[in-house]
Amino acid sequence: MDFDLTDEQRAIQDTFARFSDERIAPQAAALDEARAFPRALFRELAELGFFGMRYPESVGGSGLALSEFCLALSEVARGSMSLAGAVAMQSLMGTKFLQLLGNADIVERLFKPALRGDRIGAICMTEPNAGSDLESIATTATRVDGGYVINGQKTWITSAPVADFFTVFARAGDEKKLTIFLVEKDVPGITVGREIHKMGVWALPTSEVAFDGCFVPDSHRLSKEEGDGEGHLKKTLAEIRIITGAMALGVARAALFAAVRYAGERKQFGKPINRFQAIQLKLADMATGLEAATTLVHRAAWLCDMKRPHHKEAAMAKLFATETAAGICDDAARVLASYGYAMEYPVQRYLRDVRFTLIGGGTSEILKLVIAKEVSS
């Protein structure tokens, strides 16, 4: 049993840790306040090869494992959860089905430019009445000559206001099963609606997307067969949960570092507050929780890399890491007391942003049902 990182993994972690410290963290607050998509940093990460880490060299990627990707993504999240959410979408959900199922034209014209940061992708799955309940997805794709006509409403679509193309889940065929389509932003019948004002991740734009008689040619049906979308989605969900856990680790580490630093500098009753047992116990709990969460996330990623069963472990990792991170961010705000409530300190941003990880990829309540089903089978 070896818990050490390989030399390559350590080099990847160090590269993105430096980038986070030198490029992301200094801009994070300003980007957050401006509610501005971090396009320049997005492109810089593309130049570092971030978007191609998980894809094979044959299509312009670097063929790295999920474990390496999680190390890098966690460092990005440590600097900015908004940026981490954007690059996670670009690296997996927004592009995976193009690479996996798209034809040569789609790969050359959209997928490869996306790896370079020249195109931005998003996934359209959630609907006003279909969140955790995928069976309630109501968007339809009706067969016509030469393709399909899509009608429906999607919401909570990450990166939609800046996206160039969308991977859309809609019901098609006689049995109305989920089918995957590619829709480009400029085609008639697609409307990117109002931007949703959120509690956190202010620099990550999220909006509604409407499809009203939107024609999609046969060549843009990504599904090999009508109705195979749910199967592809289930295979991807475990990865989504693991990388969401990795993002939670990043913001938790940032919050713990802020709390430790403040507790060492802040003096009350003639000594630093980290000399008081109440603060020491809180810091100990935060550090222990983070260590345990890190182990769960990286083991789940390793199981995925080894192509071993990992759906239960992915759900456990996401559940524990995100809930633990939320607690760490809350405790950090308590350590800073009034300053944890002040906008000039980053802890308030960590506390707002961490909730993003509690929702994406499945809520904690849904994950518990997944875990219970796995352990009971």
Curated annotation (Swiss-Prot):
Could you identify this protein by its name?
Benzylmalonyl-CoA dehydrogenase
Class of this enzyme: oxidoreductase
Q: Which PANTHER family match?
A: ACYL-COA DEHYDROGENASE, ISOVALERYL-COA DEHYDROGENASE, MITOCHONDRIAL-RELATED
Q: What is the similarity comment for this entry?
A: Belongs to the acyl-CoA dehydrogenase family.
Q: Which GO terms describe its molecular function?
A: acyl-CoA dehydrogenase activity; flavin adenine dinucleotide binding
Q: What else is known?
A: The expected physiological substrate of IaaF during indoleacetate degradation is (2-aminobenzyl)malonyl-CoA, which is not available for testing. However, the missing amino group in benzylmalonyl-CoA does not appear crucial for substrate recognition, since the compound is readily accepted by IaaF.
The organism encoding this protein is: Aromatoleum aromaticum (strain DSM 19018 / LMG 30748 / EbN1)
Q: Does the keyword Flavoprotein apply?
A: yes
**Can the keyword Oxidoreductase be found in this entry's annotation?**
yes
- Which keywords appear in this protein's UniProt record, sorted alphabetically? FAD, Flavoprotein, Oxidoreductase
Cofactor(s) needed, names only, are: FAD
Q: Which domain of life is it from?
A: Bacteria
- Sites where the protein binds FAD: 123-132, 156-158, 266, 277, 363-365
Assembly and partners?
Homotetramer.
Tell me which InterPro entries the record gives. Acyl-CoA_DH_CS, Acyl-CoA_Oxase/DH_mid-dom, Acyl-CoA_Oxase/DH_mid-dom_sf, AcylCo_DH-like_C, AcylCo_DH/oxidase_C, AcylCoA_DH/ox_N, AcylCoA_DH/ox_N_sf, AcylCoA_DH/oxidase_NM_dom_sf
| Reaction equations catalysed | (2-aminobenzyl)malonyl-CoA + O2 + H(+) = (E)-2-aminocinnamoyl-CoA + H2O2 + CO2; benzylmalonyl-CoA + O2 + H(+) = (E)-cinnamoyl-CoA + H2O2 + CO2
**Enzyme Commission no:** 1.3.3.17
Database matches in Pfam families: Acyl-CoA_dh_1, Acyl-CoA_dh_M, Acyl-CoA_dh_N
Protein encoded by which gene: iaaF
